[in-house]
Amino acid sequence: IFCTICTIQAKDRVIERPPFLAWSSNSIEIDKIVMSDTVTTVYIKAFYRPKYWIKIATGSFLKDNNGMLYPIRKGVGITLDKEFWMPESGEAEFQLLFPPIPENVTSLDFSEGDFDGAYKIWGIQLDKDTFYKQKLPKEAVVHKINKKAILPTPKLAFGTATLKGKI
């Protein structure tokens, strides 16, 4: 009798620089998402003023296109609910760990919760082919557009202006 034992290791699904529909802040962006059968790892790049801090809340979660919620498990390179001080460069990287996401999920929303200043990223695409079929969520629209509003007539005038920035 001949027995063959086969073990099949599931291959991780990797989404590099996933497109998204909208975000509440450009201080954090998703560099990569790695989905395995045990954990979903979201690789974050942070951009903020040097020597100032950012924070990721313990109430953070992912919400899939089917409405299922996946609460954050922990941070790697960042401690949840603690001030993360930005280095002199103003750029940093860390990971956020979540429960595994089913393979049939095509998009995710990231949210820290519903409070002032919460980081939110809507419509993170796991399948780039469906990106242009997505609609912007209602909570992502902050300003209503008045299509009947008339813009003022442009005019040249003397005055004082201040321009701040980096070159």
Residue ranges and their predicted role:
Residues P71-L108, E112-F115:
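Short, solvent-exposed, Trp/other aromatic-anchored flexible loops in extracytoplasmic proteins
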